[in-house]
Amino acid sequence: MGGIRGVLHHMQRTAVQASPRALGTITSRWVPGAPRSSGTHPFRKSLAELRVGDSVTAGPRTVTLADIEHFAEFTGDTFYAHTDEEAARANPLFGGIVAHGYLVVSLAAGLFVAPEPGPVLANYGLENLRFLTPVKPGDELTVTLTAKQITPRVDADYGEVRWDADVTNQRGESVAKYDVLTLVAKEQRQPDSSR
């Protein structure tokens, strides 16, 4: 077996060991444990300015019982773990009312999104979403968003950015982890002065 097929076949059995910083350099992807860079909110940076490892930490935001009840009523997701204290307490995983996972993700977005127009053009999805620790009323959420992979599109004025999102509670436990996928302008757009 020759060519790229042979190389890929061989690589399936190859392990690369290195520090997180070295792995990030080799793969052009941020990996947990690699350095993060803060400063300017990364959603304010164009693709040309953005670097793997650019990061923002936002929060805390306290989750209230009213938040959970409103989300259940508004979305129609009235699963008993979010609405019935007695039944939720009997569940061995929860021990009482817990927040919806999608409420946690929505609150995290509310913490890290920069609302003004800028180089981030669109959020086009989430991948690898996992809910790791139940969130109860009174828990405080903080989110760290880190540029994980930057992929310019050859045929467009924007590229794709994959962000590592880690939502933690007041004890530093990860409650949700996922990748946020965005489309980001290659260059800062100038405001339209004709208005």
Predicted features and spans:
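Alpha-helix N-cap/helix-start motif at coil-to-helix transitions, marked by capping-box chemistry
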Residues: 2, 62-65, 102, 106
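HotDog/MaoC-like acyl-thioester-processing domains
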Residues: 2-52, 135-140, 144-195
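Charged/polar, solvent-exposed surface patches and flexible loops
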Residues: 6, 13, 70-73, 110
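Hydrophobic beta-strand-centered segment that forms part of the acyl-chain substrate-binding groove
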Residues: 91-99, 103-149
